[in-house]
Amino acid sequence: MFRIKARVPRKVIAMGLPTAWGAMAITYKLACPLAQQDSLGARVVTSAVFFAVGTGLILHVRQALVRELRQVREVAGAAQSALLRPLPPRIDGLNVAAAQHSADRGARVGGDLYEVVATEHGVRAVMGDVRGHGIAAIGTVAAVLGSFREAVHDEPDLGRVLRRLDRALDRQLRERTCDDPVSEEFVTVLLLEIGRDGEITALNCGHPWPYLLTGTTVRPLARTDPLPPLGPFPLPTDLTPLPCGTLLPGDSLVLYTDGVEDARDARGRFFALQAALAGAVRNEPITPQAIVRTLFAALVRHTRGKQADDIALLVLRNDRTRLHCDAPGARGTARATTHNPQPTNHL
């Protein structure tokens, strides 16, 4: 035997309660003898009745808005978890920490993107920055990250990974142009590949170069001019990855978006990221998690919590001498290299 429980729709309740309160106020004014009197006591009672009805309406509207805001935040949190999935603390022998902050207070997801994946070709990372921030940038972030997560397993060369990202962005921009003909969007992208021996290769399209931390020394990973951002210009024919040295055991890479160095204080001074990193590692090497916390705290102090742009940080440290990744296929590890690599799923 089935029982069907009737449930009053929330919209009916939302509209019915204010209507009932309004009807009670009008009925009191038209039908109650006390409301027809012109004495001071009658006026006080009438005013009290209408004040109570008005207060009830305001509280009802406020409660509805709070409930709707809570639902929006839950949706935003789910979107953030789907787009910028929490990174495991260890990926193929690398210690990893990342964090991001949206400049739009109404959105938990901004225009910054990052991901780190262990593949048969090495550990591959992406850091990107979509023009604009907040809700409007989510579609582009999803297109670029989705393409990256597939391409890093399929393509043996970083140049072909970058072309996959460029095609995904082009499709996204064509769809956006149909809805918004004046929309001009671009994405800065940094692709990194770290081999088993720590060798670093990179392709940079308009993004800030990361910093390499070696002991207490802080220096840019490379000083060459990057390629133009993805979107406005076609990629060049030759996309040979740039050799950037070796990430030795104990060394760290700090990837970031331009919102970090562009952050200003009340006097208009930019945030000195290299100096902040030098201060963080002056006494002793610290973990990537501590570096992220230290930099975010320094940024909040510098801007007094009023960032004008999205901020993202990603720190990778080579801990391979202290961590052995012998379990093939485990989360955050890569399978042994094969001569005929097949696409794998990112767990």
Question: Which residues are covered by each model-predicted region?
Answer:
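Conserved subregion of the PPM/PP2C metallophosphatase catalytic domain
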Residues: 1-77, 81, 88, 113-122, ...
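Short alpha-helical scaffold segments that flank and stabilize functional sites
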Residues: 79, 83, 147-150
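Acidic, Ser/Thr-rich low-complexity segments on the non-lumenal side of membrane proteins
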Residues: 81-119
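Preference for bulky hydrophobic residues occupying beta-strand positions
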Residues: 98, 125-128, 192
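Primarily the active-site beta-strand->alpha-helix module of PP2C/PPM metal-dependent phosphatases
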Residues: 107, 113-176
